[in-house]
Amino acid sequence: MPAQRKPPAKKRFAPEHVRSTADLAALQRAMWTLISRPLTPANRMPRRWRDGRPTAELAAQIAKPNDRLTSFERLEIYSRMYWFRVLDSLYEDCPGLRAALGQPRFMKLIEAYLVKYPSRSFTLRNLPSRLARFIREKPQWTRPHTALCHDLARFEWARIEVFDSAALPVFTVDDLLDANPARLKLNLQPYLQLLQLDYPVDEFILAVKQRDELSRGEASNTALVHAARKASARKVTRPKPEPTHVAVHRMNSTIYFKRLDPAAYRILRAIQRGKSLEQALSAGIPAAKNSDGDWVAKIQGWFRTWMELGWFCQR
C-alpha cells in the first residue's frame, strides 16, 4: 500500500528564529501586519485572520505567552493602543471634517483611510497628510459632501504645515532699493500656505471652533451649563459652494487665516512658483487693467500688508 503523502506545511506567518537583520525585519513586518488590522466593532482584535486561520495561531509565532496573558492578548494590547492613538490623533486634527460628516461617518472615513494609508512616520503630525488624496480616491466615504470634505482636509492639513514649518529672516523695504522689477524675485515664507477652495471652509472652521469652545468652557451656574450643552449638540451648518482664496499663516506661534482677492492670490502663487515680480503682477492683473489707478493703489496696499505680516523672506 503506497505511503500517504503528508499535507504541505503551512507557510509561517513570522520567522521561527531571529538570526539576522532580515529575520528581525520579517518579524517586525509580521507584528505590524497583525496589530494594524482594524479592530472589531467591540474594539477587540479580530479572532480570525483573513485566510480563516485563528489569529491566536499567528500571534503565537510573534509573542510568547506569560503567566497572565496569552500571545493573542499580549498583541491585542498593542493593536488597541495603536488604533486608539491614531484615531484619536485624527479626531483632534480634523474638527471641521468631523463636523461636516458627523462623528459616526467621520470615524468610518478615518479608519478606512488608515487601512490604505497607515502611519509611515515617526510623528503623528504627518498622519493627515494624505487624507485629502484619499477623499478624492474614495468618494463613497464622504458623499454627497465630497468636494466640501476635500477642501476641509486640505485646509486642516495646511494648518498643521503652517504650525511648525520653517520661518526665514524677513525681506525688508531696504532690500527693494534699486531693484529691477523685471528681474527681482521675491520669496515667500516656507510656512505660508495658499489655498484656492470651492467652499468658504475658513468661516466654517471658525464657527466649529466657537461652538466647541463654548461647549468646553467652564460654567459656574445651571444656566451656563445648559447653554454649553446646547452649544455642543448644535450642528454647524455646512457652507454652500463659494470660490474662496485663503492664506494660512502664523504670527508669534499663532495660526491665522486671511482671505485673499483672487488677483492677490494669483500674484502670491506666481511668486511662490519662482516668477519675477513683474511676471507675478502680470499673472495677477488683467492686461487691460494693469495701469488702472485703483489697481495700483490696491496692489500697493496688498504688498504693504504682506510685508507687515512678514510673508516675504530672504533666501
Predicted features along the sequence, with ranges:
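Hydrophobic, aromatic-enriched interface-forming segments
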Residues: S165, P169, L176-D178, L184-D202
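Low-complexity, glycine/alanine/valine/leucine- and proline-rich hydrophobic stretches
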Residues: L192-R273
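A general structural signal for short secondary-structure junctions and capping/turn motifs
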Residues: L152, D178, A182-N187, V236-P239
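Short, flexible coil/linker elements and helix-boundary hinge sites characteristic
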Residues: K185, R211-E213, G284
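Long, charge-rich, low-complexity alpha-helical segments
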Residues: M1-N180, S253, K258-R315
